[in-house]
Amino acid sequence: LPPQIRKVAVVVSPSALQIKEIQENGFDIVQIHGQVLPEALETLQIPFLRAFNVDNMQEWERYEAEPKCIGYVFDAVKPGSGETFDWSSIPNLPEDGKPYLLAGGLNPANVGNAIEAMHPDGVDVSSGVERDLEPGKDPEKIEAFVKIVRKA
């Protein structure tokens, strides 16, 4: 990959050993879902994005002062399920100047409304651009998604 493309490892409740392996394998950022164990945070030498499920957001304040935390990802209750959530259900967005991404069931049909409602700094998509009948991503859905994001 060209050096300007940042490589992000997406993990759930990583151990210190997993963090070490991620760093040794050339990732630039870690996106952490689940628990952030103290020993993993101590091992972390690259920046991370802290992901929160919308039903469990009471922790984000502890990351405001964490210098390694460069932003947040707000995701649905069941990440990776393709299910969206009520974007107005996020009561207080962080006001610490760190960017936040919106995730959770985004697809070409709803991403424009999501951006309009939440004004995120970016969006995160996976299942919303999957092929309908076979595994993998659908290039046409990706193109439609990107076009809508750029217009929003």
Q: Residue locations for each model-derived region?
A:
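Conserved anion-binding
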Residues: 2-110, 130
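Structural alpha-beta junctions
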Residues: 46, 150-152
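C-terminal active-site rim and adjoining tail of enzyme catalytic domains
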Residues: 103-110, 115-129, 143-150
